[in-house]
Amino acid sequence: MFQTLRNREAAMPFIMLAVLIDMAAIGVIIPVLPVLVASFSANQADQAYWYGVVAVAFGMANFLGSPLLGALSDRFGRRPVLLLGFMGLGISFFGIALTDTLWGLIVVRTLGGVMQGNIAIANAYVADISSPEQRAKRFGLLGAMMGVGFIIGPVVGGLMGAINLHLPFYLAGGLTLLNLLYGYFVLPESLPLDKRKPFAWRDANPIKALRGLAQLKGVGPLVGVVALSGLAQFVLYTVWVLYNAFKFGWGAEENGYSLTAVGVTAVLVQGVLMGPLLKRFKPQRLVIMGLVSSALGYFLWGAATQGWMMYAVIGINLLGGTVTASVQSLISSAADSRNQGQTMGAVSSLNGLMAVVAPMLGAPLLAAVSHFPQGDWRIGAPFFFCSALQVGSLVLAVLYLRRHPQSPR
């Protein structure tokens, strides 16, 4: 429990390190999980189908699990639920390494999806220890730590996977257990006893959580922004590699460099630029600016005619990296201090749902245009779709801004 502002300030590095380790552990398995799933079948169509099943199982588990963990953290505190999440993720990683059946893999990956809700708890933790004015910057720092983890993790995972396919999962499990020990001995609690509330199973219902989020002090349009913007981002993750292969003939190396550039840029924006931007603009304005930047960026990615343009657009889309942290800070500020876990759990649940929906939209859309010759502008259809989603987000954000007018600093 925090008694002083000094203690609250000291807690931020603790949660940032915990999130960095957590994301590095998750990132380690990214290059090898599809290969592991493929090892259970020699048929390429079956490999694609079962990897889709694994991805959907994880996403649905995250959708269902995030509100549950959020509600539990409002009752018992952030620290014990974070520790539970670390333990569950560790078990799931070791389970993946040890299982010798496809259904066993699906079961333990589903467990991992439920426990991945601890990211929502980390966001609630930051909300607990931050004033409303600090939240956007600190959510940005947390996002930067996630980005660093996702940059480091896949590189290490790819190198270890080349040695042994199961080795990255043992490493991920070990990192997560290290996080469990770190959290147990070092991480302080952020939620005072007098700000906790009784647990009710209805609070763990994801549909109820999303409905409550939409009704939260006029932030309904922002919930739409979270959904549409998140869907656009997950569609990008779904199609990026194959899009660049179809349009520019890129292989694994070129795609690896480009994804690293995207990740490094996101870290710089959220970890370095977010603070100075917030000194000049309020989060409401940053959301608008970021969505304009993002809508333009997606359109230009789709319209790119040469590979180098993909890198140029990363720079054009710099402000797009400010949207998530800014929206989260506005939603968090609208929630009561007793409901931060439930609120952040609902946001995480919505993102989990979008992660399930995105492959169902992005992959078929890319497949529908994949027959066009290399370099054809029509191959950019998935990115044009993402741009349209961001325009929709922009309309909702403007609607919110008109209801809650805030001028730049």
PLM-predicted stretches and their roles:
Residues 31-48, 238-255:
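Short amphipathic helix-loop junctions that connect adjacent transmembrane helices
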Residues 107-147:
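Cytoplasmic helix-loop-helix junction between adjacent transmembrane helices
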Residues 80-95, 173, 285-300:
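Structural signature of the two symmetry-related core transmembrane helices
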Residues 284-327:
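C-terminal transmembrane helical hairpin of 12-TM major facilitator-type secondary transporters
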Residues 2-9, 188-225, 247:
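Juxtamembrane intracellular "pre-TM" segments in multi-pass secondary transporters
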Residues 65-77, 269-283:
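Helix-to-loop junctions at the C-terminal end of transmembrane segments
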Residues 161-174, 364-390:
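A membrane-interface helix-boundary motif in multi-pass transporters
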